[in-house]
Amino acid sequence: LPIRPCRLPSDPWHAAATGTTFEKDHPFPVPEPHVLVPLILVALAGGGPTPAASSSPALSMPADTLTAIYRAGVSFQDFLGAAEARKVDWEATWAGAGLDGAMVERALQAGEGWRILAVAEDWCSDSVSSVPYIARLVEELPGVELRVVTSGPGAWVMEQYRSPDGRGTTPTVLLLDPSGAEVGCWIEQPSSLQEWWLAPPAPEETNRDRMQRKMAWYAEDAGRQTVQEMVEMLEGAAAGSPVCPAH
């Protein structure tokens, strides 16, 4: 597959900062303002998996709005079944996703009632390398649920919960409490990978070189840091100290 950045294509900040251009073959459709309120009202009324979004900043986004976006999502299994791009990668990552028992025990101590909202795209290399591990962790946690939305219904979440260098990206993961309020977030990549990814590349390093190095990191890590950071996010929420780099 062609190399595609997992970010919003309408993000001029990143283009100006890096001198790169945006891929146009997989644009993120951001709903126009005049359609946002009807979409949210339909989802809140229990109208099924209708895409929903909000123009309110996510850091002060009403819980019922996040609940509407969450309700617009599907289970990971449904997302996996519908995946078209990187289908083999999604299935292989899911099949091989193992967990450290100690991480599961820590996550169980965080209690129940949490809901995880993941904004992901099937073609995104970061999504396919992390979301299956998040789903595997949730599978082991009674009373914790995961829903996945694509970048259409999740566009406003991506706009407001941006990466450290200001990009709207996939995956963007929010942790919601039982009331639907955001109590944690995780954006794009595990922290140690992201630190390298956001650093200036070596002069001789091509985009393809960087992508190959990134995917080699994911293969070596095998989801361990993603799962650890999910557990730390759950622990932070349970302790009343949300973990969210966008705050």
PLM region descriptions:
Residues 128-139:
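Typically the conserved alpha-helix immediately C-terminal to a functionally engaged Cys/Sec
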Residues 148-171, 176, 197-201:
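Thioredoxin-like thiol-disulfide oxidoreductase module
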Residues 121-129:
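Conserved redox-active cysteine motifs that mediate thiol-disulfide chemistry
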Residues 112-120:
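Short active-site neighborhood of thiol/selenol oxidoreductases, capturing the structured segment around
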Residues 49-112, 160-166, 183-247:
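Non-globular targeting/processing and membrane-anchoring segments
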